Regions:
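Signature of N-terminal electron-transfer/Fe-S-associated modules in redox systems
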Residues: 1-158
Length: 158
């Protein structure tokens, strides 16, 4: 989907964020638009956004690094988020995560060699009563056990 995209030009970055300039507090919507377009927030966007919004580069970078969902590199075709919060841990999430990462041969934030899936930690999906929980491309799945995880991995082509 987004892997191995060339770095966008300043003009391309400006064209993506221009429709959002009239918003109050446009930085977050701009970052989301850039990530939606390129699968990440391109490094070259930081000085462009700083210039457009009259902010320091450090301020823009600080916002990007504060929010865990913003990435500086593209993900796989699918994103699998595994809950790391206490309720899920008490229901076996740590063992499930370790086994999932072992099966895929990657670590946290890693992408499978075939580019199919990136695995990321998330801290609470709001599914505590159905722990352990996961999210696949924005779809929340509860009561994930080894068998269900195997089905999820097959579904995303891992």
């Amino acid at each position: 989907m987004h892997s191995h995209v060339p770095a966008p030009s300043e003009e391309e970055i400006r064209s993506v964020v221009a429709p959002l300039l009239s918003l109050e507090g446009p930085l977050l919507p701009m970052l989301h638009a850039l990530q939606e377009t390129w699968g990440c927030v391109p490094q070259g966007a930081v000085p462009v956004l700083a210039d457009i919004l009259n902010l320091g580069r450090a301020e823009v970078h600080g916002v990007i690094s504060f929010y865990h969902d913003f990435r500086d590199h593209p993900t796989g075709r699918h994103v699998l988020k595994l809950c790391r919060a206490e309720a899920c841990q008490s229901m076996g999430a740590n063992a499930l995560a370790e086994e999932t990462l072992r099966k895929l041969g990657i670590g946290w934030h890693g992408t499978t060699p075939n580019g199919a899936v990136t695995v990321e930690p998330v801290y609470c999906l709001g599914m505590c009563a159905c722990a352990p929980a996961a999210m696949v491309d924005g779809r929340v799945v509860g009561r994930v056990d080894d068998a269900r995880m195997d089905r999820i991995l097959a579904e995303v082509g891992a």
